[in-house]
Amino acid sequence: MLHSYFTVKEAGEHEIVIEKSRFICHLSRVSTEQEAQEFIQKIKKQHWNATHNCSAYVIGENDHIQKANDDGEPSGTAGVPMLEVLKKRRLKDTCAVVTRYFGGIKLGAGGLIRAYGKSVSEGLNHIGVVERKLMRIMHTSADYTWLGKIENELRESQFLLKEIHYSENVEFETYVEEKETNAFSEWMTELTNGKSDIKEGELTYLEKAVNHIKETE
């Protein structure tokens, strides 16, 4: 599992108009090529009367699945520039479909490349991007006399308090980076004078919105 990666925040669409042609960018998170193809077919069905429904997607930890389709536009003028935007933004598990309704003015090869790239870029800006970071959920159980101290210290620490459970004892669920689990356990043990029970829970991805991603060259 990747320690962290960027992907589209959620499924959505965004439209721009260039020289009277409508370019509608549809974005979705996908985890398999089948999911990507199903998303593409869904958009094609919705926009069956569009001039083109071009697509691109990047899937896998090492981006081992990369596909681009021009859907009738001149070769290399649609799918590839769309794919390049996804790669430059360092996105994974993301599928983009750009629907074009021709407005009567030809854009030329260069114009098409810019238009399709711009459509995906602005679509990502509009819908949003998140960083998914792999975290370990740590479970800390203690007597209720420690409730206030542990909660206050957790909220002021670099660790992220997920939830508090109230039962026979009070239990804190905390998001901790995998490399910090030992440090967390030592810190919590010292904080409670050894009077807490600390266990490692499941690994999960925590999502955080990002405003800017440094693009690759």
From Swiss-Prot:
GO cellular component annotations of the record: cytoplasm
InterPro entries on file: EFG_III/V, Impact, Impact_N, Impact_N_sf, Impact_YigZ-like, Ribosomal_Su5_D2-typ_SF, UPF0029_Impact_C, UPF0029_Impact_CS
Transmembrane segments: none
Regions annotated as coiled coil: none
GO terms (BP aspect): regulation of translational initiation
Domain of life: Bacteria
Family of the protein in this entry: Belongs to the IMPACT family.
Protein name: IMPACT family member YvyE
Originating gene: yvyE
